[in-house]
């Protein structure tokens, strides 16, 4: 299972690197930085590898030399890492990484919802829904740059809602493939259309795509404190490992 976790974790790390302005390895710490994304716990991060004997020294080095106009980095460490203790940093939260057996998934057919692939001509619509779903309108320009540059490496899905035969772009997600693993990222719905089955419909479409590509499972991450874990579990996602998140204040 250890090697499986490493492959899953590398899928996540590789996806995060697509969003980074600076991505580098400093001894046993992998740094992902993009000041244009603001205070983001998922993208402005420090991944701690299993064997990290001088972590405090490395974090101090990063704090003084690699701040890049950020206020905070978020330290991500796998919970079964016995060699790593972060007792002197404030805990931010716990991230659960879950896996779905796509062959056992029961499809959900939402009313008045249609999920489509996004091509380059529809990027602005996907970006608009993403920014509204994650309250990230201020970073729209940076998101536009990233998604446009990385378009060929990801699969974008957009959910449209038709309550009265009128189209409302209402939800989004994307799929990223690496290490023979497919990850579901950036799943969100705009505030006015939440609790209408849109996220479920996006997941159903993602499952169809995963199966068509020959995958048996699909991964997703969720911060426990955001309280979406039960939603995923009801759909059949099962936890495979956890990460502890701590804050490294830079100022």
Give the role of each language-model region.
Residues 1-68, 81:
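N-terminal charged segments
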Residues 17-24, 68-71, 94, 148-158, ...:
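A short helix-loop-beta-strand connector motif used in the catalytic cores of GNAT acetyltransferases and
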Residues 50-113, 246-248:
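Acyl-donor-binding surface of acyltransferase catalytic domains
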Residues 54-62, 186-189, 195-208, 212, ...:
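Conserved acetyl-CoA-binding loop-helix of GNAT-fold acetyltransferases
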Residues 67-77, 210-222:
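Conserved GNAT acetyl-CoA-binding A-motif
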Residues 80-91, 200, 224-242:
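Conserved active-site alpha-helix within GNAT-family acetyltransferase domains
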Residues 137-190:
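A conserved beta-strand-loop-helix scaffold within acyl/acetyltransferase catalytic domains
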């Amino acid at each position: 299972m250890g090697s499986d976790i490493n492959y899953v974790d590398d899928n996540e790390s590789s996806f995060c690197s697509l969003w980074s302005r600076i991505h580098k390895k400093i001894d046993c710490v992998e740094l992902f930085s993009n000041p244009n994304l603001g205070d983001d716990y998922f993208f402005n991060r420090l991944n701690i590898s299993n064997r990290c004997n001088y972590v405090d020294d490395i974090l101090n080095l990063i704090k003084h030399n690699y701040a890049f106009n950020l206020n905070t980095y978020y330290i991500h460490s796998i919970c079964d890492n016995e060699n790593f203790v972060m007792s002197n940093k404030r805990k931010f939260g716990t991230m659960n990484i879950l896996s779905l057996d796509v062959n056992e998934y029961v499809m959900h057919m939402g009313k008045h919802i249609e999920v489509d692939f996004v091509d380059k001509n529809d990027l602005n619509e996907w970006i608009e829904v993403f920014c509204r779903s994650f309250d990230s309108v201020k970073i729209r320009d940076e998101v536009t740059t990233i998604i446009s540059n990385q378009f060929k490496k990801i699969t974008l899905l957009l959910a449209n809602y038709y309550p009265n035969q009128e189209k409302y772009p209402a939800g989004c997600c994307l799929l990223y493939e690496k290490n023979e693993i497919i990850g579901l990222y950036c799943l969100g719905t705009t505030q006015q259309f939440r609790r209408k089955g849109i996220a479920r419909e996006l997941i159903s479409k993602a499952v169809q795509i995963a199966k068509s590509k020959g995958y048996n499972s699909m991964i997703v991450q969720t911060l426990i404190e955001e309280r979406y874990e039960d939603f995923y579990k009801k759909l059949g996602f099962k936890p495979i490992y956890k990460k502890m998140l701590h804050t490294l204040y830079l100022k």
